[in-house]
């Protein structure tokens, strides 16, 4: 997270690599993106050591547990040597590139999705705008929280759900963030209770794990208010059970893509409980249209190809 903030703050492009990638996949991502600096933990350092043909790549180690290979430097040593200095002035414009996130394509290697600062900020502000509109329409405004809200980061930061919806959205919401190294439902429940966290986002398998633990009654989980989802549809029965099994947590979900910077449509609370098979309404900053094979718009309820337009849409596929 600090590396991401640092890179985007100086006008560099942050390339988030899949943590599960092996040596050949890492080599592809590094070569395709043209990355100049790799910031990696020991597991990733071991993998990249097997990569060849990465000329000019500077490697910075985070929490290394082994002697560093030739040319690899410890990030902690570098930052401590610099000390506390002011940030240099940097000219960053809204349409300058900010991130490359790799997404699996229909064929071949994953494609790098290039997004600008404007694209990402538009997505983050869209969630906030959708919430304000919902409060205006329903007349229901949540009371001010007794303690600072907090979210459990239980999904990867190389995915827009983790990076945008969990991490970056927390800045405007002034949420605390508690991160897990990998998913463990018992540890997740312990962290939620210990830190009195109010929200978590995860795919159906993850929220299903937490639901079963809540039903077992081993943990309190009374602080949890929102149990968000995405990435794959939930079974309607899981939606209903979330509404019944937590003290105050309500389910939420949505549809989005890496290419839309996570936004698309969304639904939550009682609306979702009433319509558990729905993905919700369109984000207000997007135009959605369903067309047939000839490009003709289809009426509501018909299946077809989905077109999306809006300011959060990416700049293009890198090197494509």
Show where each model-derived region lies:
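Conserved pre-ATP/AMP-binding loop-to-beta segment of ANL
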Residues: 83-102, 109, 143-150
């Amino acid at each position: 997270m600090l590396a991401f903030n640092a890179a985007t703050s100086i006008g560099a492009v942050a390339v988030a690599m899949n943590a599960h990638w092996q040596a050949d996949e890492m080599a592809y991502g590094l070569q395709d993106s043209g990355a100049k600096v790799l910031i990696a933990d020991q597991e990733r350092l071991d993998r990249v050591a097997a990569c060849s043909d990465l000329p000019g790549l500077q490697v910075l180690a985070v929490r290394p547990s082994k002697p560093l290979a030739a040319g690899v430097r410890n990030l902690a040593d570098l930052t401590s040597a610099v000390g506390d200095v002011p940030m240099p002035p940097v000219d960053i414009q809204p349409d300058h590139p900010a991130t490359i996130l790799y997404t699996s394509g229909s064929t071949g290697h994953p494609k790098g999705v290039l997004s600008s600062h404007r694209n990402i900020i538009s997505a983050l502000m869209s969630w906030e705008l959708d919430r304000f509109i919902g409060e205006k329409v329903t007349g229901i405004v949540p009371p001010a929280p007794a303690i600072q809200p907090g979210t459990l980061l239980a999904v990867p930061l190389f995915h827009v759900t983790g990076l945008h919806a969990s991490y970056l959205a927390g800045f405007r919401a002034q949420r605390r963030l508690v991160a897990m190294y990998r998913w463990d439902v018992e540890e997740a429940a312990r962290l939620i209770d210990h830190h009195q966290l109010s929200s978590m986002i995860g795919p159906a398998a993850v929220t299903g794990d937490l639901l079963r633990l809540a039903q077992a009654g081993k943990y309190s989980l009374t602080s949890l208010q929102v149990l968000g989802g995405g990435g794959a549809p939930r079974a309607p029965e899981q939606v209903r059970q979330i509404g019944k099994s937590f003290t105050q947590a309500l389910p939420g979900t949505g549809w989005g893509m890496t290419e839309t910077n996570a936004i698309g449509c969304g639904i939550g609370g009682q609306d979702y409980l009433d319509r558990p098979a729905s993905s919700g309404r369109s984000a207000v900053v997007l135009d959605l249209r369903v067309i047939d094979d000839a490009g003709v718009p289809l009426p509501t309820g018909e299946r077809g190809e989905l077109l999306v337009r809006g300011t959060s849409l990416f700049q293009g596929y890198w090197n494509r």
